[in-house]
Amino acid sequence: VRINAMAASLSDKLEAKQVQQSEAVFKEHVSDIQPGAEEWGLTYRNSFPKAYPGSIHKLEAAARVVSTGGTRSVRDKTTLVIRGADQVLVLVDIRPLYDPDAPKMDQMKASLGALPADYAGLLAAHAKIHGELFNRMRLDIGGGADHQRTTEELLEASTYDNPNRALIEKEFDAGRYNIISCTGELPPTLQGCWGGTYVPGWASDFTQNGNVPSAIAANMMGNMPELMLAYTR
């Protein structure tokens, strides 16, 4: 692969600035970071120093790491090293803590330990739940054979005056897929897969001037009313 040297230098400079800005915002909002490793898997804890009363004060995460073949060892109680494995399955549980004095780590480890180490079975169960939600409705405005074309081709063929119908249908499906994937105990805050960053300008909070409403807009029209409970209850 050949890369233009000037373009690469400019790209590196821009990326370095973005990293510095991201790191500064991250340190302002995230503290007391505690990674951990043991033979069973990985753990993580952090605090949110700018948490509002009644909001999320801490975060805890546990990852059960199941490896087949090879060797594994723990280094410095922070790193799990796996070498020569035929397969590695990672089961993750992440919990936001509203009460900083009520940890969930033991509960997460127990729930992860009870899961079968069967990727195909876990995926099938997951796909069944998401598939039932996703297939409750379908938008058909005549996209037809254009669904066989790539998104890039559809974007090129679409104009403001004459938008491609298959592109509209795909965008509608993408919005429903995203909200299904991002909704849990809480609705998404337009970070991560929505905004391309974990430190957006609105501090990753639940901004009501359009961010959260835009994310959950597909719930009712997509016939997924139970997903609204993450926002209303």
What are these regions (language model features)?
Residues 1-233:
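Aromatic-residue-lined binding/catalytic grooves and analogous aromatic/hydrophobic interfacial grooves
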